[in-house]
Amino acid sequence: MGRAREMGWMAAGLMIGAGACYCMYKLTMGRSEGNELEDEEEDEWEDGQDLDEEEADNWFDFTAMARPWSEDGDWDEPGAPGGTEDRRSGGGKANRAHPIKQRPFPYEHKNIWGEQSFKSFTCILDLNKCVSTQRKKRFTKNINAGFSLSPNISKHLASLSVVGNRSPTPHPTVREKALFVPENPNSSLENQGQIKMSIDEVCRETLLCCCKSFLQQAGLSLLISMTVINNMLAKSVSDLKFPLLSKGSGCAEVRGLEELMSLSEKPVLVGEALAAQMLSSFMCLFTRSGSREMLVEAISP
């Protein structure tokens, strides 16, 4: 009887001890889970602050980041078209230079005026009655990538059309012939011959109308530019005898002299006929009364 009672008390003690251990275990686990939740919340809050700081840093980097091209449109940093860029090739290998392909627009920096942009620009300037503005507009550069001729010729074609449109001559035929120059010329000999015939007539008729010779100067500049790329026109241009330089206005004479002096640096391109005309024009101006000052102004640096 006593033995059974002892066994009962022992079983009860074991059950009470097991219950106490279980309660202690639950209390300990609950406290640990609470601490972990608090730690996770603190970590999330700290991560959020780190992300905000990183976003601020990234925003600063994007606004202060240097462009891959300079103000002139030239790529001057790694990653430029046709350049190389250092990349980690992986596998513990050293850095290698990988070629970079040409990047498409808008990464390709372009600064070319289109034909429509130039027309809009000239229309705006037409509304301006200032004499100096109109004079500058007469020699505005129009460089269009669609022109098959050189940019210099395209510039003079545009100048000739603008000058013809603003010409104060009373004869409408002169303006029509000046505007007859096609907007998108090609390099064919037939088309160049038509341009030359039109300019010849414009120069001669404008000379009779005393049109300040600006239209003549634009035509002369175009012809000189075309002689550089076409030997046939180099021979025919001497037939004009440069009436601009012998009978034109002072400002146009100086501009014509500047054109001829620029050609004197390239005698191989312009040929002997044009070089002889240049020399005779210089002599004619030098012997004329009141022309020496213009000659000094033209040849001075």
Swiss-Prot record:
Tissue specificity note: Highly expressed in the developing neural tissues, neural crest derivatives and hind limbs. Also widely expressed in the adult nervous tissue, especially in the forebrain, including the cerebral cortex, hippocampus and thalamus.
Stretches for region Disordered: 69-101
Q: Which InterPro entries match?
A: ARM-rpt_dom, Armcx_regulator
Highest rank taxon of the organism: Eukaryota
Per the annotation, which location comes first and is thus the protein's main one? mitochondrion
The places in or outside the cell where this protein is found are: Mitochondrion; Mitochondrion outer membrane
Q: Where are the transmembrane segments?
A: 8-25
Cite the ranges annotated as topological domain Cytoplasmic. Answer: 26-301
**Entry GO terms, CC:** mitochondrial outer membrane
Cited Pfam families: Arm_2
Mitochondrial intermembrane-side stretches of the chain, per the record, are 1-7
Family recorded in the similarity comment: Belongs to the eutherian X-chromosome-specific Armcx family.
Q: What does this protein do?
A: May regulate the dynamics and distribution of mitochondria in neural cells.
Q: What is this protein called?
A: Protein ARMCX6
Q: Which gene encodes it?
A: Armcx6
